[in-house]
């Protein structure tokens, strides 16, 4: 099962979104 470029990018976005949100939340809390 080969991944297409689109599937790879979608998976990256899905993985990165929670990480970015958590990072922004932590920076807000620890200001």
Curated annotation (Swiss-Prot):
Listed InterPro entries: PSI_PsaM (IPR010010), PSI_PsaM_sf (IPR037279)
Membrane topology recorded in Swiss-Prot or TrEMBL: Single-pass membrane protein
GO BP terms in the entry: photosynthesis
Pfam families: PsaM
Record-annotated membrane-spanning stretches: 7-26
One GO CC term on file: photosystem I
Record's subcellular location: Cellular thylakoid membrane
The entry's keywords: Membrane, Photosynthesis, Photosystem I, Thylakoid, Transmembrane, Transmembrane helix
Similarity remark: Belongs to the PsaM family.
Protein name as it appears in the record: Photosystem I reaction center subunit XII
Native species: Thermosynechococcus vestitus (strain NIES-2133 / IAM M-273 / BP-1)
């Amino acid at each position: 099962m080969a991944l297409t470029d689109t599937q790879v990018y979608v998976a990256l976005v899905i993985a990165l979104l929670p990480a970015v949100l958590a990072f922004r939340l932590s920076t807000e809390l620890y200001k």
